[in-house]
């Protein structure tokens, strides 16, 4: 229904201009970022179409679409017309995109040194506002089997337990692992706790027969390799 102020719902748009119909007829590549986001949102509000709402969301960051990568539910909910349900839909879609991207990178990816780990994880981890501790599970030839998250939050011995780390490695028949976590401050230099946890995991790995090859700390565009710095 069109009102006196020019508002038109998506249902009253020509079929060829409706996001879902465009996708079905011409493929997802034919849609703009706002149209793709509108499909995820599904509905707009009583006075704004889903496309209008999508444009408002994309305009909340100077980075546009890329800005959604780090948005929180709280930030998205500040956009007029976006409640917890719509914010959750967006966060879920973004997370799926991240996981697909990482899975694509991981396939047949061989680790020859710390640069390879940095190239794989830097863009994903450098802007995180919480510490994330991951392990890279490797074959005997150092091809990546998987990357698994162990903990979220400040790194300490109580949340990074050898049992949890090596249980993942054993389940995936991993011969070796590399530890990786980020420093939200941007400074990748290790803390005493970082070093102690690493040594503890190396000792456990030696007993089990799974080598801990390195511990990479991701900063803002820089990384620290404990192996390179002879800390392990």
Swiss-Prot record:
One of its GO terms (biological process) is proteolysis. SUPFAM superfamilies: RuvA domain 2-like. Keywords: Hydrolase, Metal-binding, Metalloprotease, Protease, Zinc. Disulfide bonds: none annotated. Zn(2+) binds at residues 181, 183, 194. One of its GO terms (molecular function) is metallopeptidase activity. InterPro entries: MPN (IPR037518), RadC_JAB (IPR025657), RuvA_2-like (IPR010994), UPF0758 (IPR001405), UPF0758_CS (IPR020891), UPF0758_N (IPR046778). Residues 110-232 form the MPN domain. A motif (JAMM motif) lies at residues 181-194. Belongs to the UPF0758 family. NCBIfam families: PRK00024.1, radc. This is UPF0758 protein Clos_1766.
